[in-house]
Structures are given as structure tokens and as C-alpha cells.
Design a protein with these regions (language model features):
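A cross-kingdom feature that marks ATP-driven nucleic-acid transaction machinery
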Residues: 1-89
Length: 89
């Protein structure tokens, strides 16, 4: 999963640079080890992503993150949805 996540993040940042999308990038992790793998902030807003190579694994949205940031959606990116994530403007 770590290699998959690193590749997706690198490709997403490249896509944004090529398409002149100004964005800032973060990750979020709590002391209880809940995490959001990737957070992208741009003029359209903020979105969180969790990366799972196995598309059969269900998305577990971190409850702590949702409590503190209810307006930020968290999406799952897997082998079936990665292309739309990489090319999203």
C-alpha cells in the first residue's frame, strides 16, 4: 500500500503542475493512529483521500477527522478509481 500511495501522490502533484493547478498538500494523523493519507487544498476547496490498493477493502473514514473537519470529504482511491483521481481538475 505504501508504494501505491507514494506513486499516486507523486503523479497527482505532477498532474497539477502540468495543468497549472495551484494546490497545497497535507496528510493528517491522530495520536490514536487514525489517518487521512492525502489532503489537497486548492481554489475549489479541500478534499481528503485514503489510498487502498485492494478495492475490496471498505473505506473507514476516520471518525476523529470527520468530527473536527465535517466539511472536508474523504474519498477512497483504489485500483478501480485511481485514474479519475489522477486526472481530476
Amino acid at each position: 500500500d505504501a508504494l501505491w500511495m507514494n506513486w499516486l501522490i507523486a503523479e497527482r502533484i505532477k498532474w497539477n503542475k502540468i495543468n497549472n493547478v495551484m494546490a497545497e498538500y497535507f496528510f493528517w494523523r491522530s495520536h490514536t493512529r487514525q489517518q487521512v493519507d492525502f489532503i489537497e487544498c486548492n481554489v475549489k476547496g479541500m478534499e481528503g483521500y485514503k489510498f487502498k490498493y485492494n478495492k475490496k477493502k471498505p473505506l473507514k473514514k476516520p471518525p476523529l477527522f470527520q468530527n473536527h473537519y465535517p466539511d472536508i470529504p474523504v474519498h477512497t482511491v483504489n485500483t478501480g478509481t485511481y485514474f479519475s483521481f489522477l486526472t481530476k481538475k
